[in-house]
Amino acid sequence: AMLMKILDLAPGDARAVYKNIVYDMRMYRRIQMFVHAEQIIGDDSNLQDYETTVFIRLGSDHTQNYYEYEVPLKLTPAGHYNITEREKVWPEENMIDFPLDLLTQVKTNRNRRIKNTNGTMSTPFSEYDPEKPQNKVTVVGNPNLGDVQTMLIGVRNQSRTSKNVEVWVNELRLTDYDEDGGWAALANLAVNLSDVGSVSVAGRYETAGFGGIEETLQERRLDDYY
């Protein structure tokens, strides 16, 4: 869990915290995190719903090679809440919850656009989440979910005036581990060319998810091999 209290956040500006990690996310299907936002007590900046956003970045770095997912924030009114009012404190629309393959799909779309327009990978490319059209996905550079080295969580001011805001984030997690098994095939071919000689050919093919009986899920093959 983490609390971020941000003061005098200028229009279009952002503040964030990051952590260096080494993680392969390819065997997970979704990423989730609860998010709460509220106006700071005594604040006179007249903060409104959706004027600030929370975002998460995943990549080999947080400036040149990353995926970003951004969610507009609904504010929780000041007050006292009991356990039955949990959704008022942690609104569902604030929750970061999306399939990881959405990130790679946006990257694929970006690469097609670059090919057709002679663009560059260093220019941010954004699309909106088709399941949650208010949420935005951005890709910069050449990030790889198989080699995530940094994770960043931040808050951005989307309004035209400076804002103060308090944001809580909790239970960041990867879910829906891919337990589907793969398969492997081995072929050997020997051809006798009469008096000329003989030729032997061998081939092996393994799909993602294949592994030995003694191997754990994490030790199984993560990509196709042939």
Residue ranges of model-derived segments:
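Exposed low-complexity, polar/acidic, P/S/T/G-rich flexible segments that act as propeptides
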Residues: A1, Y28-I31, I56, D61, ...
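Extended extracellular/luminal ectodomain segments enriched in beta-structured repeat modules
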Residues: P11-A14, Y23-Q32, E38-D43, D49-E51
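Extracellular beta-strand ligand-recognition surfaces/modules
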Residues: R29-Q32, L47-D61, W90-S162
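Outer-membrane beta-barrel translocator domains and adjoining extracellular loop/strand segments
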Residues: S162-N164, G211-Q218
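Transmembrane beta-strands of outer-membrane beta-barrel pores
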Residues: D176, Y205-G209
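Residues on the lipid-exposed face of transmembrane beta-strands in outer-membrane beta-barrel proteins
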Residues: A187-V191, Y226
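Outer-membrane beta-barrel channels and translocator barrels
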Residues: S194-V196
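Transmembrane beta-barrel strands of outer-membrane/channel proteins
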Residues: V199-Y205
